[in-house]
Amino acid sequence: MRRWIPFLVCSAFLLVAGLPLVPQDASAQGRAALPAFAGAKEGAVCIGCHSRMNNAMVAEWRASRMGQKGVNCFDCHRAEKGDPDAFEHNGFLISVIVSPKDCGRCHQKQVDEQKGSHHAKAGQILASLDNYLGEVVGGPPAVAVGCMQCHGSQIKVQPGGNFDPATWPNSGIGRINPDGTWGSCTACHTRHRFSVEQARRPDACGKCHLGPDHPQMEVYKESKHGILYEAFRDKLNMDRETWVVGKDYTTAPTCSTCHMSATPTQGATHDVGERISWTLRPAISTKLNMVVYDDLWKEDLPEGTALPKKGEDVKAKDGKTRKVKDVLTWQQRRERMLDVCSGCHAGGQVAGFYKQFDELVLLYNDKFARPATAIMNDLYQAKKLTMAPMDEKLEWTYYELWHHEGRRARHGASMSGPDYAWWHGIYDVAKTFYTHFIPEVKQVAGEPLATQLLDKYVYSQPGHAWVKGGMTKEELQKIQEFYRQRYGTQK
């Protein structure tokens, strides 16, 4: 009898508060019917206790769209026997973690789109150099509160049912859940409000997309898009169920506008990479084609790689044989982004932007990244560098050249952030390349190898001719005269 007291008390409270314990009639609310399981009566018991223990959390749920529509705690947290993280709590079998599998009971389309995305795969970094830096050069505690909070941890359940505190709490976008699913919806739709408005605001992305190696948030803020957003952020109708650019709002785009949200001719998507034609992450950028398999797994193939045909059985990168459902070329991916751009910009302006963007990426690739990468590879082959990562100064210099400075330049160009494209970008790339990378190559390689490498990969390019040839007397005089006229005589 004692167990049902909270149920009776909370039922009365909810009736007074006017919130439904079970889903209301769909036709009366002008919406599609909720699944039959929604509005489980067990949820009232949860609310009764947690209203006293975690009132703010319950208040957030009450204010959420799910709370208003009658979807309650037990609907999302219910577990089944055999679930790795299931445990009995006050007579109910529940799980703390709500995984994409759980969300998919109502939001299957969104989960299907997310399933093969780069977001879902963000936790698969165990073999990467970034992870080596975190785990070995830094240490596991730094990884737990740093890398994994964005990329996602592999949640481990200890004997007795508790989570390993080295892996939990965690809401990283690529979290590996106990039920085997990848991802965390709450990374963007923070519990327990689950707000579409919050997920559409740039700040939701800014938790992870910022800093010296991926400064999308900083680039966005200095761009015209970010300036417009700050000026008119309260006029974007972000809480609407549908959010179509040019229809529901016109004032300013957010990250979601370009990468996820609907246009009059294109549906919304939870695959944030679907409209991206370049990869700006590796040392050398390449355009990417996308292969979609019948199990909704996706993978990128660099431009120039032979593409499979629809219906063909191929071995994917993870070793599994899958049937090809669709192939998107990098041009088709770009067309999807161009469709978004055209909602606000004329065709000539969009074409000009992409021309400038492409040229910057090619400048970075050809003038700095390819020569530096080729030199590093030759030094490894000549055994001038050990195969152990990051044990020599030159490896750190090269790493930051592409991973920090090179990314900043490319991201700056991709989102119209001039300061990041130049001063935080190509300027820093050039400074590191000429004043650190080349001198360190000379020291590591020794002669005659250093001269051979630099002549082959660097000085043979017209863009590097100034390093050896310097400037003419006339060019120097022209610069000096400019500064004299602008700033006066300088002592």
Give the positions of each predicted feature:
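Internal gly/pro-rich beta-alpha loop/helix module
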Residues: 77
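Short N-terminal segments immediately surrounding and downstream of signal-peptide cleavage
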Residues: 26-49, 404
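Positively charged n-region of N-terminal signal peptides that target proteins for export
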Residues: 1-4
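Extracellular glycan/ECM-engagement signal in secreted proteins
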Residues: 148
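Primarily the internal scaffold of c-type cytochrome electron-transfer domains
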Residues: 29-33, 56-71, 82-144, 153-490
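C-terminal segment of classical bacterial N-terminal signal peptides
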Residues: 14-25
